[in-house]
Amino acid sequence: MSISYSGHYPIERRAGEIERLHIQSAAMAPDTRAMLDLIGVKDGWSCLDVGCGPGGITGLLSERAGPNGRVVGLDMDAQFLEHARAGAPANVEFRQGDAYRSDLPSASFDLVHMRFVASTAGDPERLLQEAIRLARPGGTVALQEPDGTSLNCHPPHPAWERLKRALLGAFSGVGADLQLAKRLYALARQAGLQNVQYRPFLLEVRSMDPMVDYLPSVVESLRSTVIKLGLLTEAEFPVVLAECRSHLRKPETTFTMYTVAQVWGQKTR
């Protein structure tokens, strides 16, 4: 996911980043489906996925919007969008644009969704107001955002803790907030959304699961920021990654991901 050139998203382009995002999306798909079911996304809806990256939830939205509906994925990253367009369903289109100030027309979507955007881009209030602008009167604005404090490994390991500190420190160091989940419900209400709903979930990962490499791989994508901020040195970086990966692949090791808060509400008519 790329937010905009004016945002604070510190994750870099590297080999494997698209695959990492697809694995993340697949792991979160059951809970995303549950949220979309509760919202009531149905045939004929017009839906927008803000910060869709190489696909985001556009596939899940496409299934529900059907042939009479429309799904738009918005992102700034041309390479992500090129990947997303390959094999996209007929009712899905992708546009390059800034999540803070897209050129999409006001009041044009039944659903505006963003995941891990408001927490990482540095100005969640501004992003939420743009999402509300794009929603139709009576339409739904939905967000999924993390609380990084629930990242925990069992049994504990020093390398895990160092990578966790590097991850949280890299985002906070550029003005992002990986604990936005804690205030997301209040943020939605303060923005004027009505009938605001709240559904948190927590992913648990074992050594054989596709998400097992999540923490090392995302810190790899933060390499420049991590080193610039002094969270790890050049020499420490590969050593800590290797030690953490070795621990995560032990059969008895498990870890919990972020707690993800799903929050959605309706735009007033």
Regions found by a protein language model. Give the residues of each.
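N-terminal, positively charged/glycine-rich alpha-helical extensions of SAM-dependent methyltransferases
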Residues: 1-18, 22-23
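Conserved alpha-helix/loop element of class I SAM-dependent methyltransferases that forms part
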Residues: 26-45, 60
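Conserved catalytic/acceptor-binding region of the Class I
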Residues: 142-209
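A short SAM/SAH-binding and catalytic strip from SAM-dependent methyltransferases
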Residues: 110-125
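A short glycine-rich, Lys/Arg-flanked "PGG" loop and its adjoining helix->strand segment in the class I
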Residues: 125-140
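Class I SAM-dependent methyltransferase SAM/SAH-binding core
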Residues: 48-102, 126
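A short acidic, Gly/Pro-enriched loop at the edge of an enzyme's catalytic core
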Residues: 100-111
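Conserved Class I S-adenosyl-L-methionine
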Residues: 179, 189, 197-269
